[in-house]
């Protein structure tokens, strides 16, 4: 294994917990980049651009592999952000009731030695049950998903909202596609197993 410091360019506790599943040492740094979408920027382009920007903004002096990730939720062709408060969360979930939404998660690994970045993405579909306002309010009051795209925590009670999930890697839904990440790290000579 090459002697790289693994860096997660994120302050998200959810992404940190996901990376901890791999049982490899890493440090977390806060990325410094503008996350404003460009006018008419497609969701896939946005998440890949932001994943690269996050990874390259957290480069450190010693040889490192820096992981950047970004995610958006799309419903009816529109990007849905984090709700940030109770009323917005309720409204988002009401709009999603009975529908399928898609999560696009961009992933980048920046190699500070070669100055090269590999970038990719994964998608995940969430099909919601038909939910009434009372069910949604009870859920929001219990989990307070105010800082989660789509207004739910799939790793918690959010699972109660779903009819089915479609995707290759359930970690993608939480914000870090581990299957793709393992492939990218191995290409850089960083073995997990």
Curated annotation (Swiss-Prot):
Active site per UniProt: 70 (proton acceptor)
InterPro entries on file: ITPase-like_fam, Maf-like
One Pfam family this sequence matches: Maf
Transmembrane regions: none
Record-marked site positions (Important for substrate specificity): 14, 71, 155
EC number: 3.6.1.-
Cellular compartments annotated: Cytoplasm
An annotated Gene Ontology molecular function: nucleoside triphosphate diphosphatase activity
Keywords annotated in UniProt: Cytoplasm, Hydrolase, Nucleotide metabolism
BP term (GO), one: nucleotide metabolic process
Source taxon at top rank: Bacteria
Necessary cofactors: a divalent metal cation
GO CC terms: cytoplasm
Reactions catalysed, as given in the entry: N(7)-methyl-GTP + H2O = N(7)-methyl-GMP + diphosphate + H(+)
UniProt-listed SUPFAM superfamilies: ITPase-like
Disulfide-bond pairs as recorded: none
Stated family: Belongs to the Maf family. YceF subfamily.
PANTHER family the record matches: 7-METHYL-GTP PYROPHOSPHATASE, BIFUNCTIONAL DTTP/UTP PYROPHOSPHATASE/METHYLTRANSFERASE PROTEIN-RELATED
Protein's job: Nucleoside triphosphate pyrophosphatase that hydrolyzes 7-methyl-GTP (m(7)GTP). May have a dual role in cell division arrest and in preventing the incorporation of modified nucleotides into cellular nucleic acids.
Name under which the protein is recorded: 7-methyl-GTP pyrophosphatase
Organism in which the protein naturally occurs: Vibrio parahaemolyticus serotype O3:K6 (strain RIMD 2210633)
